[in-house]
Amino acid sequence: MLNPLKKDIVRINNLVVKYGKNTILNDISTRFYSSEIRVILGTSGCGKTTLLKSIIGLLKPFSGTVYIENTQIKDQDDPETVKILKKIGVLFQNGALLGSMTVEENVALPLQMHTNLPDSVIKEIVQLKLAQVDLPNAANLYPGELSGGMKKRAALARALALDPPLLFCDEPSAGLDPVTSAGLDELLLKIRKTLGITIIVVTHELLSIEKIADNITFLSKGALLFDGPLKDALALERGPIVDFFKRHEPNNKFHQSNTTDFFVENIK
């Protein structure tokens, strides 16, 4: 169970999202706290990415409300919604760096679009953001010269360019090897600690969940089945979330890692 006394930065009330006649999210209510790392998980097609897109205004709900910092998110034609969404950082699964631009130019884009800062100040901010994601020497490189992990870090620097209080990450470890994925997890922890921001991560990677999650939001077939601290989920003896851990652990790409034993011992 979530703590009703904590300060929330995102509040979702009775959210319903439909595609045609199909209900993708059914009566979802939850809160994301200030300075936490929240992991949204569930099987493929359960509505994880749909929930993320609904929060950031990319999908209009059938019913229900979403608030970010007490501002209701409506649609991207609403001035107040646009204003608050400019403050939100998003790291999409593919990273989407522009190949014809250097890393520095990619990271500078949000600053050029949404501020009137002089080029010299933008350059300083870009260097700071690249340092924050451990890419201090990558400014003049092009995306094609970067490894998969470096591309994710560069995209993360761009997402942080405007100093957002809230960062959404959609499957950040997708396509990464175990070592690089673990490094990205450590980076997210460092960013949360040093910048004090709220980070919402959509993932199904068990080791990432164990390492970074303060709270988890578990979806199944569009319904919210668990919403609370990771330790409470691991204490459960049965139920859909336990079945999820058991079902995914043998096929997890980290199966040979000793850290996987943590989940094996906690879900028996």
Model segments located where?
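ABC ATPase NBD coupling module
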Residues: I73-G89, A233-L236
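A short, proline-enriched helix->beta-strand linker immediately N-terminal to the Walker B motif
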Residues: A161-P165
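Helix N-cap at the start of a conserved alpha-helix in ABC-type nucleotide-binding domains
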Residues: P178-T180
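Catalytic Walker B motif of ABC-type/P-loop ATPase nucleotide-binding domains
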Residues: L167-D170
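Conserved ABC ATPase "signature" region
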Residues: D119-N137
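Conserved ABC ATPase signature
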Residues: Y142-L146, M150
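Helix-to-loop junction immediately C-terminal to a conserved catalytic motif
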Residues: I56
